């Protein structure tokens, strides 16, 4: 294998921001934050949803705080977006 062309494959902590669940896995993700877990320092990757919080795996319906994005887009670009689609 050529040296210096492969990404750094290492242990990384992923933290589910919706419930605080953390798990360690191997990844090439680049992060700026670190966390100490079990006496060892790991890079920290923050994620919005994991198997611990996703409704498919938990069996519970959960409302995400994403409502209103379409309305904001329509308010901001509604006239221009609908005008181009009509042509």
Curated annotation (Swiss-Prot):
CC terms in the record's Gene Ontology section: ribonucleoprotein complex; ribosome
InterPro entries recorded: Ribosomal_bL28/bL31-like_sf, Ribosomal_bL31, Ribosomal_bL31_B, Ribosomal_bL31_sf
Key word Cytoplasm present: no
SUPFAM superfamilies: L28p-like (SSF143800)
GO biological process assignments: translation
Signal peptide: none
Superkingdom of origin: Bacteria
GO MF term list: structural constituent of ribosome
Bilayer-spanning residue ranges: none
Keywords: Ribonucleoprotein, Ribosomal protein
Recorded family membership: Belongs to the bacterial ribosomal protein bL31 family. Type B subfamily.
NCBIfam families according to UniProt: L31, PRK01678.1
HAMAP family in UniProt: Ribosomal_bL31_2 (MF_00502)
Subunit-structure text: Part of the 50S ribosomal subunit.
Protein name: Large ribosomal subunit protein bL31B
Organism name: Burkholderia thailandensis (strain ATCC 700388 / DSM 13276 / CCUG 48851 / CIP 106301 / E264)
Lineage of source species: Bacteria, Pseudomonadati, Pseudomonadota, Betaproteobacteria, Burkholderiales
Gene: rpmE2
């Amino acid at each position: 294998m050529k040296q210096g062309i492969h990404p750094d494959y290492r242990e990384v902590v992923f933290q589910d921001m919706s419930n605080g669940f953390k798990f360690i896995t191997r990844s090439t993700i680049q992060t700026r934050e670190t966390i100490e877990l079990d006496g060892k320092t790991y890079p920290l990757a923050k994620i919005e949803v994991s198997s611990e919080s996703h409704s498919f795996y938990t069996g519970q319906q959960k409302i995400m705080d994403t409502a209103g994005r379409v309305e904001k887009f329509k308010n901001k670009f509604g006239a221009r977006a609908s005008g181009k689609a009509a042509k």
